[in-house]
Amino acid sequence: MHFKDKRVLTIKTTDDMLKILESKGNPLKDFKKGTKITVYNKMEQGYSYVLAENPGENMGEDFKPYYTPAEMLALGCFEGKYFNQNLLEFPKEWFINAIKKGKLSPQGANPECNYFKVKSRLTLQEWKDYGWVPDDDGKINKKHPILSDPNKNPDAGGIAIWFFRHWMGRRIPELDEIQIKRWKAYARHAGQIKANCKPGDLTCRPRQRQSLLQWFYKADI
């Protein structure tokens, strides 16, 4: 299996992505319990993990995400920009399908790639300021000591990259418990939509619906 290619650091177009995927992409069937994955992108280099479960299996009794990572990418999330340098870390089918659907935009964040065609996320720097991901200077956030600690949270890209890796089969019990609690708390946004929108009216609260998709909750409620 291939996990490192310097071309991922200079991706400009979906054609660049397809060339890498065609020559070095890893199919889903090759990922299984015991597979060691090496991460290589601009944000994360030198990190690796071993799958403790087969992809999509035994994610936790109280963790039942509505979407799979493949479905999230195909529907459109994070302006088509977020996961593009992780194309060798995850199954190539995910990216090829999303490219075919016009949902990836390596040349720059594009809200039109989102399912609801609106921007619905904070910046990475804001995530760092809140303590949801490790900061560049290694400062520990008192409110979120585990999430902000680079020695305990290897996911520089936040809860979505945590979910992709968790779905694949990585397990970090302490971190997993925290992220699943955050995910469960996010259900309040679904409650707000149900309280303020007619069922199936996708024009009502599109930003909040997009955020639900990006937190792996059913968005077309």
Language-model-detected regions and their locations in the chain:
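Compositionally biased, intrinsically disordered low-complexity regions enriched for acidic
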Residues: 10-154, 170, 188-207
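Low-complexity, intrinsically disordered activation/interaction regions
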Residues: 154-221
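Long, compositionally biased low-complexity regions that are usually intrinsically disordered
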Residues: 2-4, 17
